[in-house]
Amino acid sequence: MMKKAVVLLSGGLDSATCLAIARSQGFESYCLSFNYGQRHCAELVAADRVVKALGAAEHRVLNFGLAQFGGSALTDTNIAVPTEGVQPGIPVTYVPARNTIMLSLALAWAEVLGSRDIFVGVNAVDYSGYPDCRPEYIAAFETMANLATKAGVEGHKLSIHAPLIDLSKAEIIRTGAALGVDYSLTVSCYQADEQGRACGVCDSCRLRAEGFAAAGLADPTLYRA
C-alpha cells in the first residue's frame, strides 16, 4: 500500500515541483489548495491544471478569509505590490500567519487520512524575506505537530517535508523539469490576471524569470505585455 501524503499546492512553480517530488518518492498525494482572499486567484485554476497533469489521489480547495484582516499586498488591494525589485527585509507581500494556517489545515487532513507526511514547497534561498519559509520555522512546526496531535502523542511521527528549502530557483526548475513538470501550467505572479498572465515585474515574477535563465531553460510564462 502506498504511503499517503498531504501536499500543499498553490498552483505556482515551487508547489508543482513539490508535488512531483512527493509522487516520485512513492507517496499517494492528497493536494490541498486555498482561496484565502488572494488577489492572484488565477493560481487556483493553475493548481487544478497541475493536478490533472501530474496526478493526485484527491484535490481539495479550502476557503479562509485573510482578506478580512488585510495587512498584505496579496490580500488588500489598497496596498500596492512592489515592482522595484527584491529588497532586503520582510516585504508587504508577506501574509501574516498564512503558512501556519495552511500547514495546520494540512495537518488536520493528514490525521484524518492516517497520513504521517506533509509536503510544502517553501524555499529559503531565493525567497523574498518571508519568516515562515525558513528551516527554523518548518522544524518548529513539525515539533508542534507531534506534540499537538493524537498521532504524534501515540508515537506515530509526523514529518513536514520541505524538499525545496535549500535549493535555488534554478535548481528547483531543473528538478521539476527532470520529473516532467510542465511549468507553462503554473502561475507564480502576485498580480496575475484572470487568464493567469503575469505582470513580469513583481518579486515572484523576477525570481521565476531569473530561475529559468540560470537553469538554461526557456521560460514558458505567459506575460500580459
UniProtKB/Swiss-Prot annotation:
Q: List ligand-binding residues for Zn(2+).
A: C189, C199, C202, C205
Pathway the protein acts in: Purine metabolism; 7-cyano-7-deazaguanine biosynthesis
Q: Name one GO molecular function term.
A: ligase activity, forming carbon-nitrogen bonds
Instruction: Give the matching Pfam families.
Output: QueC (PF06508)
Q: What sort of enzyme, by top EC class, is this?
A: ligase
What's its catalytic activity? 7-carboxy-7-deazaguanine + NH4(+) + ATP = 7-cyano-7-deazaguanine + ADP + phosphate + H2O + H(+)
Positions bound to ATP: L9, S10, G11, G12, L13, D14, S15, A16, T17, C18, L19
- How does the cofactor bind to this protein, according to its record? Binds 1 zinc ion per subunit.
* Parts of the chain that traverse the membrane: none
Q: What is its EC number?
A: 6.3.4.20
A GO BP term here is:
queuosine biosynthetic process
What are the alphabetically sorted keywords of the record? ATP-binding, Ligase, Metal-binding, Nucleotide-binding, Queuosine biosynthesis, Zinc
- Obligatory cofactor(s): Zn(2+)
Q: What does this protein do?
A: Catalyzes the ATP-dependent conversion of 7-carboxy-7-deazaguanine (CDG) to 7-cyano-7-deazaguanine (preQ(0)).
Q: Which family does it belong to?
A: Belongs to the QueC family.
Q: What is this protein called?
A: 7-cyano-7-deazaguanine synthase
Species:
Dechloromonas aromatica (strain RCB)
